[in-house]
Amino acid sequence: MYKRQIYDRAGRKPDFIWYPCVDKGPDEGGANSFHCPMVTSQPETIQANMDEIFTKYGTRFLHPFLPLHHPAKLHKILKRIFRPFKISGSEIDAAQRKAEAAREEYKMQLYLETQRILQEIEEKKLIGIVLAGRPYHADPAINHSIPDLINQLGMAVLSEDGIAMMQDSKFPPLRVLNQWTWHSRLYRSADYVTRHADLELVELNSFGCGLDAVVTDQVQEIMSKRNRLYTSLKIDQSLNLGAIRIRPISYTHLRA
């Protein structure tokens, strides 16, 4: 999918395509906050495999590693990169401030919306599905509109990053080294689900990944300690949504 997107943008002959590498995410309270290698190095893979496309259209592909967790270092790197484009340091500084404000606003909106949905679940005696996945799983073309499908079954959908923000969200005892940003949120979300009977955890999984093998085992352990079900949907192995519907439907029967 990314090849099609990059090819389309290169064909429009922009000044450049901006796709930075980001190896660390926000601090989630773990031993570290790395992004997984796939997310971090995807731009490097694109550069290595699509260089002919960039040459064909004369498109510059900018994919620097950016330390988003270190604003001062980030500012220096951005000044150097955008100097040829006549973008001043003050403009970059203003852009950084706006970006940070936008991120904080998004986090607040996510927190408030998650609280609202949790309250609605409690008041209306609904089933809530905490739908966990990688950032790219937010794309309907990748998630096969599974969130909509769950809604159609009369269940609420929440994201693991929203659940991880809740005040009583915490890390359970872990056997693994907790150093990956997304995994950290998933562990906390799994523990939260085990302590709330009206919630269930469903993870979207798109490819065989060594890191996912580790996190799957750990989350399974967290859930099983309180006799809770853990569902991992390998959505790239089948487009049969009928089969995917079975597990969410089973939750309604278990509570009947």
Protein language model annotation of sequence segments:
Residues 30-33, 95-107, 162-184, 239-241:
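Acidic/glycine-enriched edge-of-secondary-structure segments
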Residues 138-145, 171-180, 215-217:
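Short glycine/threonine-rich loop-to-helix capping motif typified by GTGT followed
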